[in-house]
């Protein structure tokens, strides 16, 4: 890449450029509000790191304004605030992260209003295939991109760990009737493909309604079928209710894994000591060997800063910040940061290593590789087991690195213990 040509004023400072506005769709309230806490941290961190702004490829100093709007953990509201930030606030780019419920409706608005959009920490299947007019014949989107996880990656890291414990290979799937489940259970690209490949049997009860409080039907089926491995992606309240009922009703799997809810220690604390041994998705960890591109801070230093800022234990969802690192890299490289077309061209040529790992859109598209389609690069991923901690009640130990081989494994999986 060529260095930016800097235009300067008489005193040697770069010529002032227009303000770049970046809109953030954030679940500040509602069922996903734990993601909102992370957004509040990284917006503060980024604002301090950026100071007066960035020098773009046009040589001008562009101040960065971050606009945050609450999605209220609601998909309709996520779409509304994304549209408002584009039309009323004049945002040049929209960011969203966490789950398909927050990301996908916001992405549809960005596509409709022809505004660059970045996302992370969510499955790419609903983001890419779920938003197609004709899912059987998917076409690239022009404006919307993500550093996203594949449900096949999640299943891969889990089965690589499952095999370390002797079981009957019966996996009970616990999912709500939502877009997450559609991605996970996709017969062509989701969990069924990986389970079959590794010789596991999938036991799938009916999908529960989001926010359900009674899981008797699912538990009964798991017991009847002799399920020894639990796998799901659930909201915190759902998982808490399910697990307490499961133990009351005598369902004791050797392995229990869940996505989404276990990104936060608060979920485990709400369940209590009966949650020791749960297997979760490690989308980030303080021991990862990467640095923040804005400050040069290590992952451990970022975790320490987060704990000082919030008073809470660090969370893997801190990786939500990486999409902002990506956004800044794009605006620095775009020929004209104020021209959406050149911003999109800069997205397509991204080759950056963030605090969450690499994003390389210059790699050839390969459905089975890290760049599975034009709009997605896959994130790194490890399996963590939540154990009794030294500093905190629960601490995640990395037990599998099949989708992040440069990450150090900290221990072997242990079976769930029941008193």
PLM segments and residue spans:
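Beta-alpha junction/loop-to-helix N-cap segments that form part of ligand/metal-binding clefts
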Residues: 10-14, 34-41, 53-133, 147, ...
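Extracytoplasmic "Venus flytrap"
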Residues: 14-16, 20-46, 69-75, 98-100, ...
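Surface-exposed patches in mature extracellular/periplasmic domains of secreted proteins
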Residues: 56-64, 96-97, 173-176, 312-320, ...
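Extracytoplasmic ligand/sensor domains, especially the bilobed periplasmic-binding protein
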Residues: 91-205, 254-280
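Extracellular/periplasmic periplasmic-binding protein-like sensory domains
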Residues: 149, 246-321, 333-334, 399-404, ...
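Segments of small-molecule ligand-sensing domains
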Residues: 305-317, 328-395
């Amino acid at each position: 890449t060529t260095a930016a040509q800097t235009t300067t004023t008489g005193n040697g400072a770069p010529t002032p450029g227009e303000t770049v506005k970046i809109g953030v769709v954030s679940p500040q309230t509602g069922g996903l509000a734990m993601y909102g806490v992370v957004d509040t941290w990284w917006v503060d961190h980024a604002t301090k790191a950026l100071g007066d702004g960035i020098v773009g490829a046009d040589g001008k100093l562009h101040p960065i304004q971050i606009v945050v709007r609450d999605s209220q953990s609601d998909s309709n509201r996520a779409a509304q605030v994304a549209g408002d930030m584009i039309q009323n606030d004049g945002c040049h780019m929209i960011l969203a992260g966490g789950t398909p419920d927050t990301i996908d409706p916001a992405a549809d608005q960005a596509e409709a209003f022809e505004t660059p959009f970045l996302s992370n920490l969510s499955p790419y299947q609903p983001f890419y295939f779920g938003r197609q007019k004709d899912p059987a014949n998917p076409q690239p989107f022009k404006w919307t991109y993500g550093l996203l996880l594949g449900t096949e990656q999640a299943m891969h890291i889990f089965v690589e760990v499952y095999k370390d414990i002797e079981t009957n290979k019966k996996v009970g799937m616990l999912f709500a009737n939502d877009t997450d489940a559609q991605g996970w259970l996709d017969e062509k690209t989701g969990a069924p493909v990986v389970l079959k490949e590794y010789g596991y049997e999938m036991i799938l009860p009916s999908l529960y309604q989001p926010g359900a409080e009674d899981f008797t039907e699912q538990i009964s089926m798991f017991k009847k079928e002799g399920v020894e491995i639990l796998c799901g992606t659930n909201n915190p309240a759902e998982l808490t209710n399910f697990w307490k009922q499961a133990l009351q009703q005598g369902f004791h799997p050797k392995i229990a894994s869940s996505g989404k809810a276990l990104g936060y220690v608060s979920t485990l604390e709400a369940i209590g000591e009966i949650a020791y041994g749960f297997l979760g998705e490690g989308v980030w960890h303080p021991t990862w060997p990467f640095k923040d591109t804005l400050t040069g801070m290590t992952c451990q230093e970022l975790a320490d800063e987060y704990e000082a800022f919030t008073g809470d234990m660090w969370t893997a969802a801190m990786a939500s910040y990486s999409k902002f690192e990506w956004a800044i890299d794009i605006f620095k490289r775009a020929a004209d940061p104020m021209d959406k077309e050149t911003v999109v061209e800069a997205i397509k040529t991204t080759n950056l290593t963030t605090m969450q790992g690499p994003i390389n859109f210059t790699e050839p598209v390969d459905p089975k590789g890290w760049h599975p389609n034009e709009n997605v690069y896959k994130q790194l991923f490890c399996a963590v087991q939540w154990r009794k901690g030294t500093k905190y009640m629960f601490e995640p130990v990395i037990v599998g690195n099949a989708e992040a081989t440069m990450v150090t494994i900290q221990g072997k999986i242990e079976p769930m213990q029941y008193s």
